[in-house]
Amino acid sequence: MSTELTVQSERAFQKQPHIFNNPKVKTSKRTKRWYKNAGLGFKTPKTAIEGSYIDKKCPFTGLVSIRGKILTGTVVSTKMHRTIVIRRAYLHYIPKYNRYEKRHKNVPVHVSPAFRVQVGDIVTVGQCRPISKTVRFNVVKVSAAAGKANKQFAKF
């Protein structure tokens, strides 16, 4: 019952489309759940298959497909609801001085409840349709933080 309350935290009743949850039929303990393979060699997490969350923007249980660019970055902020900010560092060449300078871009990314993401984790994201005004990417894989070497410049 407690998991049901956490799933139903919005005003509207949250359910997966085309899945009919008939309360009168008692066939099995397992609830019906729709999930898919995101493709491109990314595995569907167990929490997406066995979980009870409802997220229409999830690449595994929602109506969003991954296509286009695949990027990697480090998580710098998890303050938004189901959205994180990743930092992508790169080197820019300055011809006058024949040297490189460090630059970075912050990219807002939608994160499914199937993943537990913390600041410092390295995530792989895939491009999808525009989810909001700024969000165009979705987390497809999470790697643990590299360790205490986060002050060093890492090229992805």
Swiss-Prot record:
GO terms for biological process: maturation of SSU-rRNA from tricistronic rRNA transcript (SSU-rRNA, 5.8S rRNA, LSU-rRNA); ribosomal small subunit assembly; translation. The modification N-acetylserine is found at S2. The keyword Phosphoprotein does not apply. Transmembrane segments: none annotated. It is found in: Cytoplasm. N-terminally acetylated by acetyltransferase NatA. NCBIfam families: PRK08572.1, uS17_arch. This is Small ribosomal subunit protein uS17A. It comes from Saccharomyces cerevisiae (strain ATCC 204508 / S288c).
